[in-house]
């Protein structure tokens, strides 16, 4: 391998000749061999750095044109566009497990953009610190990159995944309207419910989760950039924070603003805790939905068997013919991961000492992982399971009419205690509720038939 010599304030460093990064990135690459190739800083963060560095150059060009010249701006902008496109991803090797401020990832961006900009300009006009990092600090750039990436992963990944599954559930509601089945509470038989009513509960959970996620976005759209090292804005020109937020908004197509209090923006990560709480709520609902689906599909002979789901692959290496609810299992594992990430994010966010939180990379990594995993799991569940759900009407009807909880319909006519006696007699003697009720002398056979209508129990207020 060929090397080039780069230098920083600590001296010279050998760097692979075919890479755009410089001395500080190489030092980090050598000093933090933790999770190499597995836990690289998320590409969403890299892309966000591309946006914010271009926005910073635009703002500096407007406020300090003698330093950020048009020539520099042009070269930097092109280099940033390449970072945004992902074509320079191979030049961002650093892992999450580095300095807690994200300084080395900020310098990775500065060095790559500077070296690429110099290559574009065909001369050395850009310095990583003096030009690419102009008016900035790692302490305000990393929080900014994290907010940009968080908004993007929610709006561009999670929201479409939610919308897709909601649309599928709406379709299933229409297809299964009026199919009455046994309700269940505590994993025990309960009064009847229609299958479309049950599905509507799933759908509404997801719609509510989207609303909660949406409520977190205004906080995430406040950017720390302009606060520099401790929130005072030292070395940034007046108005830089507003202009850079405007530039980020224009570049991303999302309505970012400058954070009203930069001291809070640097040291507190409560916005991400709040937003991830909504992601955790979505994970909890997906866990519940996946569990409902696999319970309802359990069997094929010894389970509930009330729905059919797609058979995607063999389920056992020893039991021939076995097919498992694998999409449901994947969703539940992702949900567990998200819940673990939430604990990590909450604890890391509590560790902001004085003017800076130095757990920022792990917060960013876990947040993005949660949103990405959950979005992809939901799309996979939709494509390979939800769209193929169908009701086993015969099994639903059989289970409904064998449920002792249908006795609840008799409460207004014979009272709670007599209804309980009826249920116990039916169970103990393995007879029908009608036989038990009539046998106990509570109702005549004719009156029982008049008031006992299981399907109607799912619609008590329907005329």
Give the location of each predicted region.
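Conserved, well-structured ligand/cofactor-binding cores
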Residues: 1-463
């Amino acid at each position: 391998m060929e090397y080039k010599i780069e230098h920083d304030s600590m001296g010279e460093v050998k760097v692979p000749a075919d890479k755009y990064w410089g001395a500080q990135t190489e030092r980090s690459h050598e000093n933090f061999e933790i999770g190499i190739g597995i836990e690289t800083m998320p590409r969403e963060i890299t892309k966000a750095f591309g946006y914010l560095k271009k926005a910073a150059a635009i703002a500096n060009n407007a406020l300090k044109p003698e330093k950020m010249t048009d020539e520099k701006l042009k070269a930097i902008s092109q280099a940033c566009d390449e970072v945004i496109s992902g074509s320079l991803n191979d030049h961002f090797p650093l892992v999450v497990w580095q300095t807690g401020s994200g300084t080395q990832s900020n310098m990775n961006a500065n060095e790559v953009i500077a070296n690429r900009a110099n290559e574009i300009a065909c001369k050395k006009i850009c310095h990583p610190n003096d030009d690419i990092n102009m008016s900035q600090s790692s302490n305000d750039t990393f929080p900014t990159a994290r907010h940009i990436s968080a908004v993007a992963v929610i709006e561009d990944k999670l929201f479409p995944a939610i919308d897709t599954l909601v649309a599928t559930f709406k379709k299933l509601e229409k297809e299964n309207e009026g199919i009455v089945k046994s309700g269940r509470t505590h994993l025990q038989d309960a009064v009847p419910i229609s299958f479309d009513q049950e599905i509507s509960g799933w759908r509404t959970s997801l719609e509510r989760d989207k609303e909660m996620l949406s409520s977190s976005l205004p906080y995430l759209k406040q950017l720390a950039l302009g606060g520099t090292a401790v929130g005072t804005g030292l070395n940034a020109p007046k108005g830089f924070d507003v202009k850079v937020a405007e530039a980020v908004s224009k570049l991303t197509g999302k309505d970012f603003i400058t954070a009203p209090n930069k001291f809070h923006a640097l040291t507190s990560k409560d916005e991400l805790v709040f937003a991830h709480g909504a992601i955790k709520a979505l994970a909890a609902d997906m866990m519940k939905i996946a569990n409902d689906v696999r319970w309802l599909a359990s069997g094929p002979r010894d389970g509930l068997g009330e729905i059919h789901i797609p058979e995607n692959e063999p389920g056992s290496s020893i039991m021939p013919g076995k097919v498992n609810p694998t999409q449901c299992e994947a969703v539940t594992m992702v949900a567990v991961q998200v819940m673990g990430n939430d604990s990590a994010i909450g604890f890391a966010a509590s560790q902001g000492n004085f003017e800076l939180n130095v757990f920022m990379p792990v917060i960013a990594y876990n947040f993005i992982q949660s949103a990405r995993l959950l979005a992809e799991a939901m799309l996979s569940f939709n494509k390979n399971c939800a769209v193929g759900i169908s009701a086993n009407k015969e099994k639903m009807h059989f289970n409904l009419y064998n449920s002792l909880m249908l006795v609840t319909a008799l409460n207004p006519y014979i009272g709670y205690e007599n209804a309980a006696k009826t249920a116990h007699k039916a169970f103990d003697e393995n007879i029908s509720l009608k036989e038990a009720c009539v046998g106990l002398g509570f109702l005549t056979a004719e009156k029982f038939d008049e008031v006992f209508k299981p399907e109607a129990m799912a619609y008590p207020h329907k005329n």
